[in-house]
Amino acid sequence: MANDKIVIKGAREHNLKNVNLTLPREKFIVMTGLSGSGKSSLAFDTIYADGQRRYVESLSSYARMFLGRMDKPDVDEITGLSPAISIDQKTTSHNPRSTVGTVTEIYDYLRLLYAHVGVPHCPVCGRVISQQSVDEMVDAVLKLEEGTKFQVLAPVVRQRKGTQQKELDAARRAGYARVKIDGNMYNLDEEIALEKNIKHTVEIVVDRLAMRKGIRGRLADSLETALALTGGVAEVDVIGGECMTFSQNFACPEHGISISDLSPRLFSFNNPLGACEKCTGLGTFMRVDEERILPNRDLSIREGAVKASGWYYAEGSVAEMYYLGLGKKYGFTLDTPIKEMSTEAVNALLYGTNEEKIEMHRTNEFGSGVYYNTFEGIVENLERRFRETNSEWMKEEIGSFMSGVECPDCHGKRLKPVVLAVTIGGKNISDFCEMSIRDELKFIADNEPNLTEKQKQIGGQIMKEIKNRLQFLQSVGLDYLTLARSAGTLSGGESQRIRLTTQIGSALSGVLYVLDEPSIGLHQRDNDKLIATLKNLRDLGNTVIVVEHDEDTMRSADYIVDVGPGAGVHGGEIVAAGSVKDICKAKRSITGDYLSGRKRIEVPQTRRPGNGNFLTVKGARENNLRNIDVKFPLGEFVCVTGISGSGKSSLINEILYKTLACELNGARSRAGKCDGIEGLEFVDKVIGIDQQPIGRTPRSNPATYTGVFNDIRTVFSQTQDAKMRGYGPGRFSFNVRGGRCEACEGNGILQIEMHFLPDVYVPCEVCKGARYNRETLEVKYKEKTISDVLNMTVEEAVVFFANQPKIARKLQTLLDVGLGYVTLGQSATTLSGGEAQRVKLANELARRSTGKTVYILDEPTTGLHMADVHRLIEVLQKLVDAGNTVIVIEHNLDLIKCADYIIDLGPEGGSAGGLIVAEGTPEQVAEVPGSFTGQYLKPLLEKDAKLRAEGK
């Protein structure tokens, strides 16, 4: 077939060197290579970008306005492309309304199921709600007191956008005189103009009555008319009282509580009809967190117990005046530890004295005096200032003392009581979503046989769709998640696999899928399931391209493309392409070296014993952790492992890192639940090294992040030419006026908006991309301008600045972590996650080590090739050799086998996790039968021991 291949000719995007490549269609293809070799440039920035661009360009210009505009990649030609879908790790929603259920669309099916099959109950008495007859409605109204005025309303429109002219005209034609719109009364003979883009509620006034004898017949007729107009709903608006809602469909005869209509939107927490009115469907409020204001209750006010903006203790301050007044009233001094103060005193300090006044003494330059005033409380004060301020800085400052607290009305369930009273199998929609996916599948299997024939007929197809999607999530190792889990709390790997299941559920064929390391965050045990899922996607008739470093995934692929041979300027070529055997045979392929065994990451011959001290987390209870005590040996390379969802991130990121950051670094983050951490006296600081960008603007680069650019600017300012002109280091900054080119403000490029076409970036015509003005560029050091230096690779700069020890030392660390190919001025936004992390590592290596630092890394091998992992391990071992402690969350067995100590959590994910399954050296963990990590580690250690015995 002519169309069974994707043919790429002359790809030059980023560092690609005029690449020509032919890929088979409808196959499972892995693209691999060193970090920075150009594989993402080929997969995402060339193949996906062109497939997506062509599809978008086929749409109208109006439609293109609402879609992401993509640049045309730098490539001569690509043939055989299909519409492309990219599933990367960067698109996790941070919208608090976005959950696993909404992202996977399972929640939409659940809303449909509960609307059609759910059994409504009274939220007060729990009685099953049944239909009301007109007689029952009349009886309820006749219970009103004699003389009570009321009107019968027909709600023809409920919370719907539009001008509603059709309904208003129909009411006029039917002879009605009045209508109630959004709570306001209107005469129908006047012109009524409603805002088109706002939701409205329109209620026709059917009749106006006063309670007296003999109105039963008229009331029944009016109610029947209202029911006919609305399809079964009527309201009785009691003047000066509460409105009574009646339904021919569902209502509690005892409490009169009725549900107007069991529609899917009633079960949506994003719709005012069903969302909890207090929290508007968020389930939480942002409130000032008293734990952040009083993080250490062992301290007194004078010692700085209060950590709140405007309330830090200082002698002679207004804060001190209030503290002394509170102390006099509630019996404490400024030297009383918070934990020894009465509950009443602490409550007054935080939440105020209500109407009670306190005595305060104020002394200033005009004299002294006694004042009596109420105290609003630190919490109330901060919340009021947060509401009233227009300053973004102040909002951010006070916001750092706030955290989400559960809504007191819905208790975090997001929906109204009447909605939560609708159940299937005894569980409401929120209860179902709070179960793990594993438990949800069991619940469906247990309850499906109990449904009536009618329920099965209505909900059978819906339940099938829900089951399929839940099983897809289970198949990619996510059965520990709940549908209620906020999408913003998911890791990159989790969110990517969730979107992957959505695509499988859509069952498209003839599509090109491009995925970015889907194995991230996945334990080896679940990797086989993921590979089967990717093959399933291929078998539907799709082409699946995966950027991946995982050995099992490579060995399962139909076709492998190895990009290299090195990284950056040393990469950008196709080193090898074909089957696993072809890659292993390729002489220039570093991937082939590791797959064939020509190179390998060796197990250390000895394990460090540590320095004898420990950091001990007592009673860890965050998320699914089950009140466990965990000991971290100091002075060792510690690896925390376990099945996805077993509690690793809760233990390390939420408890250990946040507690250490608060205690040692003065951070304000709220740590996860535990009884405390022992051994803090043995460490002096904690450093978290993640894969977040080193800067979010093109102005950030490796030179500015590591601080080496300050030293370079100083060197330029000390040249004879600079001294003669009076140029200081600031002259050589591209961020401030003076030395930079003002035409492009030091960017070197200009952005030209093209509206319906992608924005065009062109080199600045004035400085020709050099960033600086002509006068600044006349100053040279060793015949090079400051712009020339920014364009140097780290390798070149190490040689160039060899006689500048301070600069050379910082540059050498960048070289040590494998970033020799990166230019000093390379924009931070173009660095991969792995590269950004290694820049941070280099920055830490360049510092003078105290030997008492704890380094915490979460899956540092993400985005790293086997050769990069090898180099990363060497860097981490250097940090530990200096006496520091490195704690790593990891699934990569090559890194795990090199650790001194392993803490394995499990045994499963979610509610079945949260325990320590095994701990000790890799050899000790490998012998624990219940440890999944140990099961995969054992053959690896045995293989290494065998090769070592053979002298290989």
Residue ranges and their predicted role:
Residues 1-952:
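Conserved phosphate-binding elements of NTP-dependent enzyme cores
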